[in-house]
C-alpha cells in the first residue's frame, strides 16, 4: 500500500532532495541540497537496498540522511518530522501507526522514495499492514497522532491500496501443499505469511507456494539475488509432489 506526505519546500531547509528509485524498495542512496547559516551545501548518503516488505534487512539512506542532518540544521520541518515520527524505525511506532495481528505479524513501514515536485518535497511510504486491519483506520490514527503532536498541517494520503490475499493455513489446499513440503524436506515448519505481492492476486482461491528453507539467506529483490542449485532441484521435487497430490484429491 502506497502512502505519500507532502511538505512545502518553503517550510524546510531543502532546495532539492532525491532518494530511492522504487517505493517498494529500501533506498540505498539519497542526496540533498540544503541551506544552513546562509550557505548552500550538498550531502549524499549511501545505504543498503532491501525489499519493501522487509525494510529491516536494509539500511534506509533517506532516514540516514535526515538523521545526520538533525544535529546540523535547525528550523527545518521535514527534518523535525523525521526526528519526531520516523527516526530509524520500520514498525510505525513513533508515527502512531504500529499495529499487529497473530495471522500476519506487525505492520512494516518502508520510507521508499523522496523527491522534489514543484514547490513540494514529497515523501513516499510503502506500508504492509496486517490482514485483520483496515487501512483507513491506520491512516486516520496516524493523522490524528500528527495533529495532536504539532503537525496538524501534515497529512498522510493514500496513493494505492491493494486488498489482502489471505487463506487460513488449516484449509485443505494449504494442508496438501504443506504436506508436500514436509515430506520432501523433513522440515516441519508452519506456513509463513509474507508482505509481498504475488501471482495469487491473479485469481480467487489461490496462494503463492514455495520453500523458504532453514538456514538460507533471503535475497529476493536485492543485489546479487541467488538460489543454491541444490535448493532449486529440491523445489522441483516439492512442486512435483504437491501437484500430484492436488490433482488426485
Locations of the language-model features?
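Short amphipathic alpha-helix segments
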Residues: 1-14, 32-35, 88-106, 140, ...
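Fold-level recognition of mixed alpha/beta catalytic cores in primary-metabolism enzymes, strongest
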Residues: 1-63, 223-228, 234-235
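Short beta-strand elements
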Residues: 5, 32, 36, 45, ...
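Short, conserved charged micro-motifs
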Residues: 38-42, 132-139
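Hydrophobic residues embedded in beta-strands of well-ordered beta-sheets
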Residues: 41-43, 119-123
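A common structural junction motif
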Residues: 42, 73, 144-151, 246
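An extended, acidic, His-containing surface patch that forms the Zn2+-binding/catalytic region
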Residues: 53-118, 137, 153-249
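C-terminal catalytic subdomain
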Residues: 121-135
